[in-house]
Amino acid sequence: MSELTIDPATTALVLIDLQRGITAGQTVPNAAPDVIARAARLAAACRRRGMLVVLVRVDPGADGALFPRPQADQPRPPLTVTPEWTELVPELDRQRDDVVVTKHQPNAFYATDLEVHLGRRGIRTILLGGISTNVGVEATARAAHERGFEQVFIPDVMAAREVDLHEHSVRRIFPTLGRVRPLDVVLTALA
């Protein structure tokens, strides 16, 4: 594992779907409240270094109407979206300089202005966390990789609905797209 150095001028923190509707469910291997607390700690450290913090939320539309619903062997269950469902969790302590991106698909780059925000600020590296590891985080990671971004994945700031789905992303997918590091290593690099 190589040493981690972070250039605050060219690095952004991107947190995926830490919102009421997503974090209300059971998550593994990290419980959602733990992911939120760690994400808040990481966001505060990034802000202290003057880094861009991007808070991504998903709005699937009324009852999930904006999510794709293909014929599938394991279709997604119906989704009930309340007005609070899309609200970012308050523990993230959103600041005026934070960028909020609203997406309608798992990938935070698809049909959003995320790439514009990153590009105009000269961002080359993304620190990535959120829920769900294997859906929103992985879809965004693949898209970031295709766009040439360096990435640092922080698994203890991630969770999924099933542990094997989380572990597959962390052990098999993310190491091919960037570097996987625990939160304490990232915080040390930010100190």
Where are these regions (language model features)?
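A charged, well-structured terminal subsegment
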Residues: L177-A191
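Glycine-centered short loops/turns at secondary-structure junctions
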Residues: R48-M51, G122, G148
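A short glycine-rich beta-strand->turn/loop micro-motif centered on a GG-aromatic cluster
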Residues: L127-G130, E150-V163
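Active-site-proximal loop->helix
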Residues: E162-P175
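Internal catalytic-core helix/loop-beta-alpha segment
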Residues: T82-W85, V89-G130
